[in-house]
Amino acid sequence: MICCVEVRLTIPDNEARTALSTLRRLGVSVERLERADLYRFDVEKDAEKDLVATLRGFETVYNPNKHALRVREEERPGAGEVWVDEIDGAEVRSGGAVRIGGRALPGVRSMERFTAWKLMCATGAAVPERVVLEATETLLCNPAFQKATRK
């Protein structure tokens, strides 16, 4: 079973602000930009609930003072989104337990980590796919060592 978990800052995100400012200066038509860490897990049946509780206890992944954590319904990027990960080593598969920060994730067969970018217009609606592509190629993904997954 695939389980996607999003961890988003609840405090101001300076990286997203800087990226938004840069995209605007480069002429990309985007009004709002949000960033989140996204983990896509292949978990054993009935392990999702325990996984979320485990992640909430990992301070290297989730700090309740500055993060919001949610399980996403979708296994792929939605409208206005791009997920960026490194070409080499983004997916962790293990004969033993998959680990984050040295700590085991029981019931997890594999894990992928992405940076999820959501691009929006002034109303909060997703920007058109052509704008996502332009932002991805212009700034959000460096094809020398990263790959982008779009809708």
What name fits each language-model region?
Residues 1-151:
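Core nucleic-acid recognition elements
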